[in-house]
Structure formats: C-alpha cells, structure tokens
Amino acid sequence: APHTRVLRGGQVRRVPTREIVPGDWIVLGEGERVAADAVLRQAQSLTVDESLLTGESVPVRKRPSDAALAAAAAGPPGGDDLPQVYAGTLVTTGHGLAEVSATGGGTQVGRIGASLAAIEPAATPLQRSLRQLVRLFGTLALAGSGLLVLWHGLRGGDWVQGLLAGIALGMAMLPEEFPMALTVFLALGSWRLARMQVLARHPAVVEALGAVTVLCVDKTGTLTENRMALRRLVTPEADVTAQAGAPLPEPVHRLLEYAMLASRRGSTDPMDRALLTHGDQALNDTEHLHPDWRLEQEYALTPELLAMSQAWLDECGQRRVAAKGAPEAVIELCHLPPTSAADILAQVRRLADAGLRVLAVAEGSAAGAAPATDQHDYDFRFLGLVGFEDPLRASVPAAVAQARGAGIAVAMITGDHAATALAIARQAGIDTAAGALTGEQIAALDDAALAEAVRRVRVFARVLPEQKLRLVEALQSHGETVAMTGDGVNDAPALKAAHVGIAMGARGTDVAREAADLVLLDEDFSRIVGGVRMGRRIFDNLRKVMRYIVAIHVPIAGLALLPVLLGLPPLMLPAHVVLTEMVIDPICSLAFEGAPEDPRLMQRPPRHAREGLVGWPMLLQGVVQGGSVLLPTLLAYLLALRAGQHADVARTLAVVGLMAGNLLLVAVNLSAGLGWRALAAPGARPFWVVAVIA
C-alpha cells in the first residue's frame, strides 16, 4: 500500500496513505505524489505537476498561505503561486509542509470520479438502428405467423399443419443472422483496432467511430509529445531555431552554456531537462561543456524573485555565475535601462504568441572570496532568451488533414493559454479562423449561446474540467456525433458523455480509462483517424450484409408462405429453414466482414447521426433482389409438381435452386460499389468455400 510522510507528535513518520485524515500535516518532497488535498503552510521552491487535473504538463509554482483552511482550499487547480495542492499530483521540485483539507471522495479527484455516476452515456447510432430493426422485423414476423396459423386452421381445419407453417414463416421472417453478423463484425473490428494499438473497451463503439462528425482533442500529449523541448535561442546577435541533433551557430553557444549552468542535473523540472539534454548534444564538441566545474552555491527561485542562479568554480578556481528565470526577473537582476527592457519584453511577447514558454538567461560575476548571500549581490549581464515548446507529433498534420478531408471537424480543448493553443492549432492544421474561446468566456455564456459559439470555434483554451463536459454537450445539442480524447481525471466526465471517449494508455489515469470507450495504447493521434476509417468500413460492410440478409429472407419467407396460400404441399419445412438460416447464411455473411473498403471512404462526409443501418431504399433493394430469386424458384417448384413429380422431388429442386440463388445474392451484394474485384479479396474465402460445397 502507498505510504506518506506525516508530521505527528513533532516527528516525521511514514504512514499508510489511507490513514491520513483532515488536519494532518503531510511532508512533500521532490518526486513524491501528493496524498490528499491540502493547503501549503511551508514551502521552499515548490513546483507541482497538476496535469492529472488540468491536462497541462508544465509544473506550477506553489506559495504557502496563512489564510483560514476552508477559504484557502476553495480554489480550482492550475495557476501559479496558489497555496493548494491536490491528491494525485506530483511534486517536481522543492519541498514543503501542507495541512490536509480533504481525503478520499472529498478531494478534487474524488469529486470528479463521483460525478461520473450521474452521466448517462449516449447510445451509438448502431444501437439505435438495431433497436428499430428488431422492432420492425419482430412485429412483421409475429403478425405474419399468427395470421398464417389462423388462415390455415380456419380454412382447412388442420391446425397442426397451420402451426408448422406459422413456425416456418416466423423463422423465415426473423433475421436471426443480425446479431451473429453484428457480433462477428464488431469482434473482428476490435481485433483489427487492437493491432493498430487501439483497445476497444466496448465493441459497439468501433462502428460509432465511423459516424464521428466532431473530434475533440486535448493538446498536451495527444497533439503534442507531452515533453518540453528547446526550440528558440535569441541573443542580440542571433535568433536561432533549435532542432534536435542539429548543430547550433557560434553566437548562441554562450547563451546555451549559461542556461545549462543555471539548470540542476537530475532535476525533474521539464525545462531543466530540455536544456541539459539539448545542450549535451549540441555542445558536445565545443569548449562550452564543463563536467569538471564544481557547484559552489545555489540560489533557489522565490515568489519575490522568479529566477534561480547557480555559482560554479571552474578549473582555475574562478567563480562563474549563471541565472535563468522569468524575463522580468532576469531583467531586474541585470538592472537594464527601460528601453532595453522594453525591447526584450516585446521579443518575449512575440515568442509567447508563437506558443513558446520563455526564460531569460544571464551571466554574473562578483568580487570576494566567498559566494554572495543573495542573487542581487552579483553583477549580471543579460545574455538572451530561450524558448521551449511541447513539440507537435510528426504524424498530426497529415492526420488532421485526412480527418478534415473526411468531413470531420477537429477541435482542440486545452487548459493552456490561448496564444499557445492557437500556435499549436496552426501547426496541426486545425481551423483557427474564429480564434480561441477561453474558459472565462465559456463561463459567461449560457447553454444556448455556447451551443451557437461551438458551431464556429475550433480552439478552446484555459478550459476547466466541468467546461469540457459543457462543450461536449453543446456539440451534441446540434446532433453532432462527438469523439473526445483525454488522459486526466478531469477529462473523465467529458469522456463518458461523448459518443466515443478515447483515453490515453501510457499516461492516462485509471479514472479516465474506466470512463472511456477506447484506449489509445501508443497515444498517437493518427490512430484515431485510422479508427474512423475502420468504423466507416465496418458500417459499409454491415450495410451490405444487412441488405443480403433481407434479400435472402424474401425467398425463404415466400417459399414458406405462398405454397400454403395456393393450396400446394408445403415447400419450406422448419428443417429447411433451419438448414438455410443457421448454416448457409452465417457462413456467407462472414465473407462480408473481410470485404475491401471503398477507395473513396475517407473522401465522403460523415453520415448523419440519425441515418439508420438499414433505410427504406435499402430494404426495397433487398426485397427486389430477393424477389428475383423467389420467382424462378417458386416457378420451378410449381412446374415440377405439374409435371407429376413427387412433392419431395419438387421440394428438393426448389431448395437447390434457393441455394444457387443465395450464392448469387452474396456475390451481388459483396461486389456492390467495388466491382467484382471484391470476390477476389482474402475476406471472400468463406463465400468460395460455400460455393464449392454447394
């Protein structure tokens, strides 16, 4: 069981996390998970990764508070310099002491989990279609069987034969292949998705993917790689875009050198790690790496000065000082004149508008044998700016373009700043013409106004967890079929409410995975678009098999009904119906699952949410196809009887004709829209097996 350090009786003890209660004081250290919602009472350079709750990978600063516990514990997660820490979040730097305000179901995580019980997941289009089909065919079968029994019994008085005829007709009219075909298609679809690193928790959702009209995606970790990478280095002499593994020009070497010297080796801070990783590669063959220098003094970042410095002794014993931090703080350390400061801050804004997180770097010096007691005691010289980004996944632009080509609107929902969200959206190819709608603006809109706004806007920034759910519901109010991705506890309500909830596998929380329908094992956005392709293919092939099933039931039902109405010996006995429907039809239906996809599959717009699996035009096609088999088969039966053949011989002739017609119906429906090449596909092997046996 997990344990937590707790201050009790003036001593720090490790106790099981489940034994923590409100009022306990918990000790927080770098790399540790926070055990409960709490309010910071003491802290030193404490930053916390709250992506579990906010979806944003950049850690936030924490500041202790002496305010009343109840008032201090009221704020939402996210934002710098707040005193609250939350259960499940990760301490990335520093240490602290916090007073527990809530445990278990009373925490932010617990409340989000409890809210899932109140959300009813929407039925998939396939489920709605099947309910309609079951009602239609069930009603027809019951009515037809009952009328046939009454007609036969009242007309001839032979109630036993009438009952057998009614049973045969009911069996012929009830398409029991529907559930078999559906189960096989969805099971094999789930298997194919699993081979694409997409785990389907609910098989019915495989088909629903093909009906998606709006794909709502989180930025961090879905469109991006969920890591900080060094992207820009700006000095007075140069402005360089950094690329992993690529050499850097000499004018930015010193900037990167001192940015590394101001970073802690072994730190969990993502920007420190990005600087050190990139610098170790880019400066490997230069004199700007200093493994032999000794760290003399570290000056931690404080709420009053958002910059940190490290003093080093080089191989000659000379002190070298490096500082990095918020540009405003480093400008203050360098005592720059207002004009220079204004120029630097203008450059910072340009970098921020490009979606970068910006730090400033400075080089310091001081007289004296001992290191200074405060960062302000050094004479700093401004070196430049370093910009970081969470890199866009390489496969995303092509996948977004493919989704938009298929008529699917891609919307980004993130907790990040609007400028960053818009920059990433532009790189990904998401529509940014309407700008970004922020969480603050969403909160000011009523449901009707929000429903109107989501028609145009495709980028949503600074969004709170409960607002993600509102956005999904607003889209659904227009009849959109919504897919939603997420990984944090905060995403769970929206994942459950969406028609297709997609959780991240590697970094997703258990709560998010439980609420989702699909789990993206390798977190590659392009897999979602591949899943949409798979869903559309399954729906197309399901339509083909449903039309075939309707078509084959026309001659089966007709051959069971018409001879009785004409006063002839029964043609289709229950045994014949069982043989036809339970053996031949299912085997032929399997051929449809492996049918190749339409080459224009991803150029078509999504089908309408209310479009059923089998519409009246398709039913009519099936009836016409079935009638073309029924008429010659019935005619052969009548001619055989008129020629004086025994009823068994005539019946055998008709059943053989029905089997041949069945194969013809399979071939016609299998090749619909694809040409006869569909019969050569590997998935058509069951058809050829049955054809050879027949």
Predicted feature locations:
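Juxtamembrane helix-loop transition segments at the membrane interface in multi-pass membrane proteins
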Residues: 1-7, 106-118, 154, 161-162, ...
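Hydrophobic alpha-helical segments characteristic of transmembrane helices
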Residues: 1-4, 105, 116-196, 205, ...
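Cytosolic catalytic regions of P-type ion-transporting ATPases
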Residues: 2-128, 247-250, 256, 444-454, ...
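Membrane-interface segments at loop-to-transmembrane junctions
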Residues: 8, 125-135, 166-170, 201-211, ...
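Basic, amphipathic juxtamembrane/active-site segments
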Residues: 47, 54, 64-66, 70, ...
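Cytosolic catalytic regions of ATP/NTP-dependent phosphoryl-transfer enzymes
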Residues: 84-92, 211-382, 388, 401-402, ...
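Membrane-water interface of transmembrane alpha-helices in multipass transporters/channels
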Residues: 129, 155-168, 178-181, 198-209, ...
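Membrane-embedded transport module
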Residues: 148, 186, 432-484, 498-677
